[in-house]
Curated annotation (Swiss-Prot):
GO terms for cellular component: cytosol; mRNA cleavage factor complex. This is Pre-mRNA cleavage factor Im 25 kDa subunit 2. The record marks 33, 179 as: Interaction with RNA. It comes from Arabidopsis thaliana. Its main location: nucleus.
Amino acid sequence: MAMSQVVNTYPLSNYSFGTKEPKLEKDTSVADRLARMKINYMKEGMRTSVEGILLVQEHNHPHILLLQIGNTFCKLPGGRLKPGENEADGLKRKLTSKLGGNSAALVPDWTVGECVATWWRPNFETMMYPYCPPHITKPKECKRLYIVHLSEKEYFAVPKNLKLLAVPLFELYDNVQRYGPVISTIPQQLSRFHFNMISS
C-alpha cells in the first residue's frame, strides 16, 4: 500500500506580507471575461490555466491562501498559460506576478508539487466540471490545480487592490455558495495527503 504524500505546513506567522502596485482585472464583468475568452479561443484554441494551492497552518489546521477581489469574490493565485508554456513554469510566472516582490531577492522559491485536480469548461459559460462531458469534443478551457510547497519563511507582496486571506479547510468544505465549486472541493482533493504541522 502506498504511503500518503506529506505536505509540510508552517505557521502563518512565519510569513511576512507587504504591498505592491494594484493588479487590475482585465474584465469588469463576467460577460466581458467570457467574451474575451471567446476571442482568445478563436486565436489560440483551448485555454489552459493553472492555479496554486498555497498552504499554511493556524491552530494546527491547514489554511489555504486566497486572493480576495472586492468584498466577496475569492480566487486561487494563478492564471492562463502562454501557448506551449510548461505548466510548472507558467504557474511560477503567475505566482510571481500575483505575489512576488519587486526584486528577485523578494520572490518566493516556488516549488510546484502535485496536480490535485483538473477542471473543464465545456462552453463559454461560468460552469466548470471535474471531467469533460462526453458530448464535448472541443472544450474551451482546462484548469489544473497544483499544490505549491512553501518554504519555512517567505515574503509575499500583495497588490494594493487585493487582500490575501488564509482560509481554513473546514470553511471551504462544501461551501459552494461562498467559494464556488472549484475552491469548495479542495478539502476533498487534499484528503489523500498527510499534513505535517510544523510549529515555529
